[in-house]
Regions:
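Secretory targeting signatures
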Residues: 1-26, 44, 144, 334-366
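Short, compositionally biased P/S/T/A/G/V-rich stretches that sit at domain boundaries
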Residues: 21-37, 119-137, 221-234
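Structural beta-strand segments of beta-rich domains
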Residues: 38-44, 138-144, 236-242
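A short beta-turn/strand-edge loop motif at beta-sheet boundaries
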Residues: 48-55, 149-156, 247-255, 299
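Exposed beta-strand face motif in extracellular beta-rich ectodomains
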Residues: 55, 98-102, 156, 198-202, ...
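Conserved aromatic beta-strand anchor motif in extracellular beta-sandwich/beta-rich domains
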Residues: 59-63, 104-106, 158-164, 206, ...
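Short beta-strand and strand-turn-strand segments in soluble, beta-rich domains
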Residues: 62-73, 155, 162-174, 263-277
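Membrane-proximal extracellular "stem/stalk" segments
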Residues: 178-341
Length: 366
């Protein structure tokens, strides 16, 4: 009975926990230091002690010895003492529950330099101490919202990745994140400049340490776009100013358009249009943009439309407000006093006469 129980426990452990394959050291100067995969995607980390060029990374997905899919990824160059990461996605439609194997091999022409296997189980629910509530990504970064299961605190490691094609162009690891009583949101901002209108993938790999060691990953594609926000609007009869804040790793190369309408309720009655170029802005940058009207506005109520226009001409953000200009009050001129019409400098003449009198009196006494 005891041997049967031990056998059952071993089988449960095999089904729940991924089995990490052994490194095959064919060329000790280049190794696959890490390999991860599930039924959707995976990643490979390669470290090298020598310079290599034009290598092929071959990745296979198999079940019970039957190869389901093969991916080939070019490695144009890897420098001595460096590491590269490659990401991949599977598009296997029909999948059965059970164990699968992902294998990665590096080839220089037909010569295999290194290989590694990774075994995982698909379709079998595993015990987990966390719940992923939401995952989002955009041109600024990636966010993940994580909740603990009641009464089951956990410590996790997060590895964020920014993927361009098969190339992992940015990665950031955050270790020992506690998940205990409340929902935890973790946000990572990209530290790379992105190309406008290009497709990227955001990946996060989560290592859960308890109650059972396991790894899960989430993938969120996005299209890189410019994004800025208009804040701190000031306006009066002479002009307007705003603060423009960058919220994307795609450089904002546009301008700000100030449009004044009068009367304010008629969108066809444009009074003034001023366009001011903006400096390049990325996430976290801000700049003050000012517009001065060619002539001060007359008394009245105006609508002010402020638009941040991107490099392609699309309006990215808009703010509307009202400018109220009151009639300028003319200060009345005070009436002149009779004494003010006296001969200019007459008070000075009196002072001069008094001074001369004092001098004459002193002269006579002497």
């Amino acid at each position: 009975m005891r041997s049967i129980l031990i056998t059952v426990l071993i089988l449960i452990t095999i089904l729940v926990c991924p089995v990490y394959g052994e490194e095959e050291y064919i060329d000790s100067n280049i190794v696959i230091t890490d390999l991860y995969s599930d039924m959707d995607s995976g990643d490979v980390t390669i470290s090298s002690q020598n310079d290599y060029q034009e290598l092929i990374l071959e990745i296979k997905l198999s079940k019970d010895g039957n190869i389901l899919q093969t991916k080939n990824i070019d490695i144009d160059q890897i420098r001595a003492g460096s590491a590269v990461m490659k990401a991949f996605s599977w598009d296997v439609v029909a999948t059965e529950d059970g164990g699968y194997t992902a294998s990665a091999s590096i080839y220089d022409n037909d010569h295999k330099l290194a290989s590694r296997n990774y075994n995982f189980v698909h379709g079998r629910p595993a015990i987990s101490s966390i719940k992923i509530d939401s995952v989002s990504s955009d041109s600024a970064g990636m966010s993940i919202m994580i909740s603990p299961h009641p009464g089951v605190p956990a410590i996790i490691d997060l590895n964020f990745m920014l993927v361009d094609g098969n190339d992992v162009i940015y990665t950031k690891s955050i270790e020992n994140v506690p998940i205990h009583t409340a929902t935890t949101t973790v946000h990572e901002e990209w530290d790379r400049i992105l190309e406008a209108n290009k497709d990227y993938e955001a990946r996060v790999k989560i290592d859960i340490h308890s109650p059972i060691q396991r790894t899960v990953s989430y993938l969120k594609p996005f299209k890189a776009t410019e994004k800025v926000v208009i804040t701190d609007v000031f306006k009066d009869r002479r002009g307007s100013s705003i603060t423009l804040e960058g919220e994307s790793q795609v450089p904002f190369e546009g301008y700000v358009r100030f449009t004044v309408l009068e009367p304010w309720y008629d969108p066809e009655r444009t009074v003034k249009i001023v366009e001011q170029e903006s400096p390049l802005l990325l996430s976290g940058d801000d700049e003050t943009i000012e517009a001065i009207w060619d002539e001060p506005l007359e008394a009245g109520t105006y609508r002010l439309i402020i638009e941040a226009v991107g490099n392609g001409g699309a309006v990215i953000d808009t703010k509307e407000t009202i400018i109220e200009v009151e009639e300028r009050r003319v200060q009345p001129t005070p009436p002149e006093d009779e004494n003010d019409r006296s001969i200019p400098g007459f008070a000075g003449v009196y002072a001069l006469i008094a001074l001369m009198s004092v001098i004459l009196i002193r002269s006579k006494k002497n």
